[in-house]
Amino acid sequence: MSAMSDYLENEILDHILSVGAYTMPTNVYVGLATASFNDDNSGTELTGNNYSRKQATFSAASSGTTSNSGAVQFDPATGSWGSVSHFGIFDASSSGNLLIHGAF
């Protein structure tokens, strides 16, 4: 199951209700974690051992779902990343805002 972050929920509501304009990110990036990200943009993303977020592209949504339109491949780990079980989609290659998160 996946969820939108508080940041994205607020941006979409403000955009729909004409109290702010949401600027779509130029690119989105997939990040990984060993536990759930939280709606408030907290959580512990992987670090070190050759880890970095990877850019992803997605097809247009249909019936409330979408999927990545190309493989998202992470570089080989140079040490343990632990048991990766969760993903986050972010609006920047580092830092930035969590948009969507969920478990594998």
PLM segments and residue spans:
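Small cysteine-rich, disulfide-bonded extracellular modules of the LU/uPAR three-finger superfamily
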Residues: 1-87, 91-104
